[in-house]
UniProtKB/Swiss-Prot annotation:
Family: Belongs to the ferrochelatase family.
Residues that coordinate or bind Fe cation: 207, 288
Gene name, Swiss-Prot/TrEMBL: hemH
Record-linked Gene3D superfamilies: 3.40.50.1400
InterPro entries recorded: Ferrochelatase, Ferrochelatase_AS, Ferrochelatase_C, Ferrochelatase_N
Purpose of the protein: Catalyzes the ferrous insertion into protoporphyrin IX.
GO MF term (any one): ferrochelatase activity
GO CC aspect terms: cytoplasm
Protein name: Ferrochelatase
Enzyme Commission (EC) number: 4.98.1.1
Gene Ontology terms: biological process: heme biosynthetic process
Keywords carried by this UniProt record: Cytoplasm, Heme biosynthesis, Iron, Lyase, Metal-binding, Porphyrin biosynthesis
Pathway: Porphyrin-containing compound metabolism; protoheme biosynthesis; protoheme from protoporphyrin-IX: step 1/1
Cellular localization per UniProt: Cytoplasm
Length: 335
């Protein structure tokens, strides 16, 4: 009888035992309502990693001008997406899946420009008595404008909590992982849906950056180019030919010189071909994928009478991506 009671106690203890390690997925965020569009834009253009003006007063002034010039247009975009960004609900669904697949850790997320902010999430983790943290950048390639900005925000939030000092590890890039690239390639093939790949120009579209950011030492362009070369190698290994495989940059803002070629330019250049686009710099769908690529550029493709225009979804909350994240975390070396 004592043995049975002991086993029951062990089962109860295991069932109620809380994870001591948390994995925080870091991303830019997106408006959770039309009201939050202004909050999102204000926070983004007040970020010194985005608007690299050293003088705080000047940065805030220029940022306010940009926000005022873009807010109504941005609201119309989010109206077409159902009144909010899809990024937060998809990320929530991903963490739900992660927690079911790996109950030994607690998976959550923090956004850079909209709630839940890192400060809010870390306060909650402190109450949960978490002993170890993994900050996981949801951007496959590293950039000061995304990865570094998110890490800086998360570490500053952590420093502000004087009594919460967990062990911290980071995952700052993962584009070179073959498992990831196999998932990407499968996503492309699923989108083709038995169409002949050799009939299509495959465009890997990534978020653009001002050339000045790259000239200052940001490795983003180099990593995007390397990522495409790795995917090309994988396609050759698996004998999956495309008419052409190209890299392009989207979402240019303002009069500055940005990375080229633009996605629009490549769509127009290959107007006589079938086109399939994969959003290589994003893991979660957002306005740049669902509106810009799938609505705005689709209209452009229709005007150009392009034979066929396909847009691949991001990895989102797929079980394949969730298992990939868990694998990265489990294989992360202690520092």
């Amino acid at each position: 009888m004592n043995l049975i009671n002991e086993k029951l106690d062990n089962l109860e203890n295991n069932a109620t035992k809380s994870p001591k390690e948390a994995v925080v997925l870091l991303n830019m965020g997106g408006p959770n309502s039309l009201y939050e569009v202004g909050v999102f834009l204000k926070n983004m253009f007040d970020d010194p990693f985005i608007l690299t003006i050293k003088n705080n007063f000047m940065r805030k002034m220029v940022g306010k001008m940009i926000v005022n010039s873009r807010i109504e247009k941005s609201k119309k975009i989010y109206e077409k997406l159902g009144g909010k960004s899809p990024l937060t609900p998809i990320t929530f669904a991903l963490t739900e899946r992660l927690n079911k697949l790996d109950p030994s850790r607690f998976y959550t997320y923090a956004m850079r420009y909209t709630p839940p902010y890192a400060s809010m999430v870390l306060q909650d983790l402190a109450l949960k008595e978490i002993e170890s943290l993994v900050f996981f950048s949801m951007y496959p390639q590293y950039s000061s404008t995304t990865t570094l900005s998110s890490f800086n925000d998360a570490f500053n939030a952590l420093k502000s909590l004087e009594t919460f000092r967990p062990k911290v590890r980071v995952i700052e890039r993962f584009y070179a992982d073959k498992k990831l690239n196999e998932i990407i390639l499968n996503t492309i093939l699923n989108t083709l849906n038995n169409r002949k790949s050799q009939d299509f120009v495959l465009i890997f579209s990534v978020h653009g950056l001002p050339k000045s950011v790259i000239d200052a030492g940001d490795t983003y362009q180099q990593e995007c180019e390397h990522h495409v070369s790795l995917l090309k190698e994988l396609m050759q290994q698996k004998n999956i030919p495309f008419k052409e495989v190209l890299l392009s940059y989207q979402s240019k803002l303002g009069p500055m010189k940005w990375l080229e070629p633009s996605t629009e330019e490549l769509i127009e250049k290959h107007r006589k071909s079938h086109i399939i686009i994969y959003p290589l710099a994003f893991t979660i769908d957002n306005s740049e994928t669902l509106y810009e690529l799938d609505m705005q550029y689709r209209l452009m493709a229709e005007r150009l009478a392009i034979k066929e225009y396909l847009v691949c979804p991001c990895l989102n909350d797929s079980i394949e991506f969730a298992k990939f994240i868990i694998g990265l975390v489990k294989n992360l070396k202690s520092e």
